[in-house]
Amino acid sequence: MDVAGKFTGDIRQNGELLRQLREDTFFTRLQLAKKSGLTNFAVWAIEVFRRHPKLVTAARPCYAMGYDIVVVRRPGEE
């Protein structure tokens, strides 16, 4: 399994990751919004750190671009 990125509690890192994935897959914000069922504003707001999306909301654009979100336990946390 190839890991494309990691969503964390850091709103800036999450926004940058979503933007990078979108650019790597050659989607415009509008195209991604339409394909994922989000508004163009919602995609923009995540990418520019205005919103911290719930996991379900973050998964929608990722899935639309062909990515899955995998949940993995952090080392040392049991």
Residue ranges and their predicted role:
Residues 56-72:
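DNA major-groove recognition helix of helix-turn-helix/homeodomain DNA-binding modules
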Residues 12, 22-24, 52:
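Short amphipathic helical patch at the helix-1/turn junction of helix-turn-helix
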Residues 16-34, 60:
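Short basic helix-loop element that most often maps to the first helix and adjoining turn
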Residues 1-16, 63, 75-78:
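N-terminal flexible/basic segments that precede or flank functional cores
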Residues 37-53:
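Recognition helix of helix-turn-helix/homeodomain-like DNA-binding domains
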